[in-house]
């Protein structure tokens, strides 16, 4: 089986930023799990994880928020979080002037 998802970088500040912008964009969002959390969840479900392939995915801010019909007040809150992000967070997510950013994703091969 293949599982593909956005993954948290794990480190507290970067994780908090990711979870915050995801929740503001989509109030039904639960959590972006780290690679370690995914591996543990799959193991608990009886899977043995083989290969894990990671990549970075650029998110166009306007498209990303439009897909979920994010209300304008929440779009502005996301922009405010991005503007206030630490250098470490801003660099990790490669936050651009228009709000676009890059996130981590992983593909898990499990049997």
Place the predicted regions along the sequence by residue:
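Conserved class I S-adenosyl-L-methionine
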Residues: 2-29
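Conserved Class I S-adenosyl-L-methionine
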Residues: 36-39, 43-111
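A short hydrophobic/small-residue beta-strand
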Residues: 1-2, 49
């Amino acid at each position: 089986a293949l599982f593909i998802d956005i993954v948290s970088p794990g480190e507290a500040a970067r994780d908090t930023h990711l979870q915050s912008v995801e929740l503001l964009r989509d109030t039904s969002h639960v959590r972006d799990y780290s690679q370690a959390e995914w591996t543990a969840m799959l193991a608990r479900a009886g899977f043995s994880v083989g290969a894990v392939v990671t990549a970075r995915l650029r998110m166009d801010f306007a498209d990303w928020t439009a897909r979920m019909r994010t209300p304008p007040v929440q779009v502005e809150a996301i922009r405010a979080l991005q503007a206030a992000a630490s250098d470490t967070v801003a660099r990790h997510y490669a936050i651009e002037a228009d709000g676009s950013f890059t996130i981590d994703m992983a593909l898990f091969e499990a049997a």
